């Protein structure tokens, strides 16, 4: 039981750290690319319509999810072995920081309940400097029970304020997590898109 508990803590911390680190890396790269251009006409991004969504399917993990056609899908460069795929919002200008949607699966040797994993996540988020915006039961589009938590991590040396939504659901000994990570200032803008992605998520096996 202790080993499983510690494994759960590690998985959650790695997930959060990987997500935040990835966003910081993109921000630094964007800032580094800014050279002699003194100004850039920033175009306000337009949320994709329903017809502009593609389907990502992974038979190995038995999952399926829809994502915007103008977002970048990547299965490489992910920082934790539990990560399956990440999706990044379009860059609108040279200093833009993309929002990130990360899908992961953690496998345990024993069956896990949604309630037990929820207690683990909530305990993990009870850290100094973490602001929990909300934590509530959630139902996926196909009726699968899940849970969601929205929180703001400690800012540290990050040059922007991130806001994170973590949704998790459980099937047998597998925990599936869907993480939305972006600038707090743009969090609400992409929220309808993220909600559609989350609602489209299916466990196919």
Describe the role of every protein-language-model region.
Residues 55-57, 64-66, 72, 104, ...:
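Generic structural detector for well-ordered beta-strands
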Residues 44-81:
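N-terminal "mature-domain start" segment
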Residues 76-177, 182:
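Conserved polar/disulfide-associated segments of primarily extracytoplasmic proteins
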Residues 70, 134, 148, 199-200:
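Extracellular/lumenal ectodomain signal focusing on beta-strand-rich modules
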Residues 68, 84, 118-122, 191-198:
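Extracytoplasmic/secreted envelope proteins and their assembly/folding machinery
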Residues 71-73, 174-205:
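Surface-exposed amphipathic alpha-helical segments
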Residues 27-52:
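N-terminal, intrinsically disordered, polar/charged segments of Gram-positive cell-envelope systems
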Residues 2-28:
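Sec-dependent N-terminal signal peptides of Gram-positive bacterial secreted proteins and lipoproteins
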């Amino acid at each position: 039981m202790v080993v499983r508990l510690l494994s759960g803590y590690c998985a959650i911390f790695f997930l959060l750290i990987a997500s935040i680190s990835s966003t910081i890396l993109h921000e630094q790269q964007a800032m580094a690319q800014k050279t002699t251009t003194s100004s850039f006409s920033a175009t306000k991004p337009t949320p994709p319509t329903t017809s502009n969504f593609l389907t990502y399917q992974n038979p190995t993990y038995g999952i399926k999810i829809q994502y915007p056609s103008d977002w970048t899908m990547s299965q490489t460069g992910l920082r934790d072995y539990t990560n399956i795929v990440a999706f990044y919002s379009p860059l609108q200008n040279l200093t833009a920081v993309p929002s990130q949607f990360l899908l992961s699966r953690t496998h345990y040797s024993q069956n896990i309940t949604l309630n037990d994993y929820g207690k683990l996540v909530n305990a993990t988020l009870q850290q100094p400097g973490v602001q929990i915006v909300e934590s509530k039961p959630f139902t996926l589009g196909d009726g699968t029970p899940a849970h969601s938590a929205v929180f703001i991590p400690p800012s540290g040396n990050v040059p922007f304020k991130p806001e994170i939504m973590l949704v998790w659901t459980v099937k047998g000994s597998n925990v599936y997590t869907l993480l939305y990570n972006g600038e707090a200032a743009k969090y609400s803008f992409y929220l309808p898109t993220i909600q559609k992605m989350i609602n489209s998520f299916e466990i196919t096996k």
